[in-house]
From Swiss-Prot:
Organism: Listeria monocytogenes serotype 1/2a (strain 10403S)
Name by which UniProt lists this protein: Protein translocase subunit SecA 2
Domain of life: Bacteria
SUPFAM superfamilies from the UniProt entry: Helical scaffold and wing domains of SecA (SSF81886), P-loop containing nucleoside triphosphate hydrolases (SSF52540), Pre-protein crosslinking domain of SecA (SSF81767)
GO MF annotations in UniProt: ATP binding; protein-exporting ATPase activity
Lineage summary: Bacteria, Bacillati, Bacillota, Bacilli, Bacillales
Catalytic activity from the UniProt record: ATP + H2O + cellular proteinSide 1 = ADP + phosphate + cellular proteinSide 2
Length: 776
């Protein structure tokens, strides 16, 4: 991606600072390790009271540069220092693959530690976190900076030890889950995360954009009638195209009138949209999504009778991750494997809202400029393209577009065969396991040996990528093709043209295409890239346009069956347009997810803040007497002109509040008393009972009960919000915006949640027994 004017201006500004850093390389040359550590301590102390100047930055970068030269034998070049300065400004640095992002990270992490910040370095997976912690961590430790690796499966004591380090490496999900788990603990001492100061995200586009569609969830099992999934599967398998409508690129499908009638007959209900048929409607819609929108070997893979999600942007299977809200169960029913119980959400947060809690955030990646608008709007981060140290020496060809997949397949085999014969290594990129296996079959038939990398054999990824640059090697890979690792070329491959990259489909995002192209031509190596696509590819199949349908039909009728590609500007323009439309649709989905999550994010922050206060004080923030009085007044005092039917609600609430408690006045007697008198009796009796116990004992009991009830009700509230989110589009009507309806009804549910746990806490206060314990 080329630099724009603003990028060039920023790079020019930092180039001079970077050159001054390089000129300082003699400053620390003669110091031993102890003296370098003294320098580290000097800078740490200085910035506790004074701001950091550009001159300070130059000296600190020079210190880190000297340590890197000694420990790992790498001297940071000017462009790496420019990139680090960009990161220090809270921006995304786009640096081409192989240009040294890992070394670049050293400088910004070191300088943030000098500022007094704890640093979290987030990578795409635990393998990369471990690798980078070992390589760059040793440089930081040489300078007296503590470094740790945040892995899954550690106990609280181990986690707490990790979070005392200055720099912590880990994955986005592990940091996010630690945050969620911290807000489920019962004792303050069990919290592990100690502040969210600065986060540096490697492969920022993958983590902040691609993974943003899947929220982080902590869950347990939810009781449900799983047989409904199998029944709904039978219904959906019988559906014809005229029973439903769908917009595949928006991932949305719905029943038309014919489909509704068929479903109502199948389920034996008068109206599919009645309250009684809520479960049947929900599960029918889930099975429709599973059958018509979710595709095997593209969206998921079945391995050992288990449905595994495929990350659409990396091609990797995601063990342990499940589609939420019942979709995973629907796919299991569709595929005829065991339908496992749906999970119940205990805690959840989106990637976007987790990382937006950090005081400062920076990112680095090989491809980000195409998504700059999203980085700005959601994370308030600009993207700056960092120039390469050596000129990119890769030949990028215009797409070859064929009429049919069959013609495309033949052309790919021909292209690969002559490159294989001359010994040039070739990487063939596919967008799904299905197309990956189809191309593999064609290569087998042509007698071309090759290695295959996809979600089914991801365990061999490092080994496969290590061989991909060898002379004569043909590698067939989905999007997962070794992101974060270099494809190193054999020495004699350079004269053969370097690594050739053949893309077999344009992806839903130009960024993914650029990543594939970026496998070749690293660090000034020669290389070649070309996409060979067809009019029957998924990208164009999803592209709904009357003009495109007419053009496609016309082209296929007139197509010369010589297997040659189409050289038409109009078709190239359609491909570009289709890709842009799908990018826009996917951005809308992510923005939509964030808009809905912002409703619950505000609620989550309020609940977690109250939890923190409870853990901090070890007692209630307000007196139990005040809560009891409010609940009693709410239950017993009502307007005199209240309708008869609403009186029943009041009586029911009064019975629930007093029923089964130690309160000495019977409910029959209570009904004969004045409401205000009842309230005062309840409050005074509780006060008398409470005073029988030591203050610390009763405070601890009340705090524990309150916390327990709040947590239980919060889980129920999250479930209610999921149900609301699922059904809001089905209930949207007229000109009403579903999001506005969700915000309004979500606020009402939150008010109910707060009222409920206060109510049950008041009930519990009236259950105090003579030993100071609460029954039930």
């Amino acid at each position: 991606m080329r630099q724009n004017y603003d990028d060039r201006k920023i790079v020019k500004q930092y180039r001079e600072i970077a050159r001054q850093i390089v000129k300082k390389e003699g400053l620390y040359k003669n110091m031993d390790q102890a003296e370098l550590c003294e320098q580290t301590n000097f800078w740490r102390e200085k910035f506790k009271t004074k701001p950091m100047t550009d001159r300070d930055k130059i000296n600190i970068f020079a210190l880190a540069r000297e340590a890197a030269s000694r420990i790992i034998g790498l001297d940071a070049v000017v462009v790496q220092l420019i990139g680090a300065l960009v990161l220090g400004d809270g921006k995304v640095a786009e640096m081409k693959t192989g240009e040294g992002k890992t070394l670049m990270s050293l400088f910004v992490m070191f300088i943030e530690v000098m500022r007094g910040n704890r640093v979290h370095l987030v990578t795409a997976n635990e393998y990369l976190a471990r690798r980078d912690r070992e390589e760059i961590g040793q440089v930081l430790e040489y300078l007296g900076v503590s470094v740790a690796l945040n892995e899954s499966g550690l106990d609280i004591a181990q986690k707490k030890a990790i979070y005392t380090a200055d720099v912590i490496y880990g994955t986005a999900s592990e940091f996010g889950f630690d945050y969620l788990r911290d807000n489920m603990v019962r004792q303050k001492e069990d919290k592990v995360q100690s502040g969210l100061d600065f986060v540096l995200i490697d492969e920022a586009d993958s983590i902040l954009i691609d993974e943003a569609r899947t929220p982080l969830l902590i869950s347990d099992r939810k009781e449900e009638d799983l047989s409904l999934y199998h029944k709904a599967n039978k219904l959906v398998k019988k559906m014809m195209k005229d029973d439903y409508e769908m917009e595949e690129h928006k991932r949305f499908v719905w029943l038309n009138d014919a489909g509704i009638e068929k479903a109502q007959k199948f389920w034996g209900v008068e109206s599919l949209y009645s309250a009684e048929a809520q479960s049947e409607l929900r599960i029918t819609m889930l099975l429709m999504r599973a059958h018509f929108l979710m595709h095997k070997d593209k969206d998921y893979v079945v391995l050992d009778d288990e449905v595994l999600i495929i990350d659409p942007h990396t091609g990797r299977a995601l063990p342990g991750r499940r589609f939420n809200d019942g979709l995973h169960q629907a796919i299991e029913a569709k595929e005829g494997v065991e339908v496992k119980e749906e999970s119940r959400t205990l805690a959840t947060i989106t990637i976007q809202n987790y990382f937006r809690m950090y005081k400062k955030i920076s990112g680095m990646t090989g491809t980000a400029k195409t998504e700059e608008e999203e980085f700005r709007q959601i994370y308030n981060m600009d993207v700056v393209v960092i120039p390469t140290n050596l000129r990119v020496n890769r030949e990028d060809m215009q797409d070859d577009i064929f009429y049919t997949k069959k013609e495309k397949g033949r052309a790919i085999v021909y292209e690969v065969s002559w490159r294989y014969e001359k010994g040039q290594p070739t990487l063939i990129g596919t967008s799904s396991i299905k197309s990956n296996e189809w191309i593999s079959g064609l290569l087998d038939a042509a007698g071309i040996p090759h290695q295959v990398l996809n979600a089914k054999n991801h365990a061999q990824e490092a080994e496969i990528i290590a061989k991909a640059g060898k002379r004569g090697m043909v590698t067939l890979a989905t999007n997962m093709a070794g992101r974060g690792t270099d494809i190193k070329l054999d020495p004699d491959v350079h004269k053969l043209g370097g690594l050739a990259v053949i893309g077999t489909e344009r992806h839903e995002s130009r960024r993914i295409d650029l990543q594939l192209m970026g496998r070749s031509g690293r660090r000034g190596d020669p290389g070649f890239s070309k996409f060979m696509i067809s009019l029957e590819d998924d990208l164009l199949e999803q592209f709904e346009s009357k003009s495109w349908e007419k053009l496609s039909a016309k082209l296929k009728r007139k197509a010369p069956r010589d297997g040659k590609p189409v050289n038409s500007r109009k078709i190239h323009a359609v491909v570009v347009d289709a890709q842009k439309r799908l990018e826009g649709a996917n951005y809308d989905i992510r923005k939509d997810l964030l808009s809905y999550d912002e409703v619950i994010d505000l609620q989550r922050k309020m609940v977690y803040k109250e939890r923190d206060l409870l853990l901090e004080r070890n007692k209630l923030g307000v007196s139990s007497e005040k809560i009891l009085r409010e609940v009693a007044e709410y239950s017993f005092i009502h307007p005199s002109d209240i309708p008869e039917e609403e009186l029943e609600i009041y009586y029911s609430r009064q019975k629930e509040l007093l029923g089964g408690t130690k309160f000495p006045i019977s409910f029959d007697q209570v009904t004969l008393m004045e409401p205000r008198e009842v309230v005062e009796e309840i409050v005074s009796w509780h006060k008398k009972e409470r005073n029988k116990f030591p203050a610390e004992t009763i405070a601890a009991i009340e705090r524990e009960v309150y916390l327990n009830l709040m947590d239980q009700m919060w889980v129920m509230h999250l479930d209610a919000m999921v149900q609301l989110r699922e059904g809001i589009h089905l209930r949207a009507y007229g000109q009403q915006d579903p999001l506005v309806m969700y915000q309004k009804e979500g606020a009402q549910l939150f008010e109910k949640f707060q009222a409920d746990y206060h109510f049950y806490f008041a009930h519990a206060l009236l259950e105090l027994d003579p030993d100071g314990l609460i029954q039930g």
